[in-house]
């Protein structure tokens, strides 16, 4: 089974969200989308706001929202250390839509680089949450 799966842990400051065997995962790294499969080369990279798509050994998919963090791939398994991590089914669509609206308003009214950068980061997080909600409903 070691050739067809690997151990994944997804943890945030608040809690452990996932701890088990998976076929593969997909996550948004600092340089783009990453697909991690069994026997992947060791890697340490930053994670952008987005999601981790977990494909369990049963073939079932689970989507987890990540606000950012670190991905560590080792021969013994993979660890996602997230700033914030929320299961797709636990996300609140109304709150995500409101966050998106507020961030868009902030971008329109921003007067400096710092305001714009912060609003852009908040917009990216809101869009990522909405994407996870959409994928979870499939």
Swiss-Prot record:
InterPro entries: ATP_F1_dsu/esu_C_sf, ATP_synth_F1_dsu/esu, ATP_synth_F1_dsu/esu_N, ATP_synth_F1_esu_C, ATPsynth_dsu/esu_N
Keyword Cell inner membrane applies: yes
Keywords: ATP synthesis, Cell inner membrane, Cell membrane, CF(1), Hydrogen ion transport, Ion transport, Membrane, Transport
GO CC terms: plasma membrane; proton-transporting ATP synthase complex
Topological type in the membrane: Peripheral membrane protein
A single MF term (Gene Ontology): proton-transporting ATP synthase activity, rotational mechanism
Compartments in which it is found: Cell inner membrane
Highest taxon of the lineage: Bacteria
Primary site of residence: membrane
Record HAMAP family: ATP_synth_epsil_bac (MF_00530)
Family of the protein in this entry: Belongs to the ATPase epsilon chain family.
Description of how the protein assembles with itself and partners: F-type ATPases have 2 components, CF(1) - the catalytic core - and CF(0) - the membrane proton channel. CF(1) has five subunits: alpha(3), beta(3), gamma(1), delta(1), epsilon(1). CF(0) has three main subunits: a, b and c.
Task of the protein: Produces ATP from ADP in the presence of a proton gradient across the membrane.
Protein name: ATP synthase epsilon chain
Organism: Proteus mirabilis (strain HI4320)
Organism classification: Bacteria, Pseudomonadati, Pseudomonadota, Gammaproteobacteria, Enterobacterales
Encoding gene, per UniProt annotation: atpC
């Amino acid at each position: 089974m070691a050739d067809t799966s690997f151990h994944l842990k997804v943890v945030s400051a608040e809690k452990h969200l996932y701890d088990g065997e998976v076929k593969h995962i997909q996550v948004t790294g600092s340089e783009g989308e990453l697909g991690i499969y069994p026997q992947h080369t060791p890697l340490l990279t930053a994670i952008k706001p987005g999601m981790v798509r977990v494909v369990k050994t049963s073939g079932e998919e689970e989507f987890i929202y990540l606000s950012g963090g670190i991905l560590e791939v080792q021969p013994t398994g993979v660890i996602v250390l997230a700033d914030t991590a929320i299961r797709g089914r636990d996300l609140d669509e109304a709150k995500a839509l409101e966050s998106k609206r507020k961030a868009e308003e902030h971008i329109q009214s921003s007067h400096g680089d710092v305001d714009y950068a912060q609003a852009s980061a908040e917009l990216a997080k809101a869009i990522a949450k909405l994407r996870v909600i959409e994928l979870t409903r499939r």
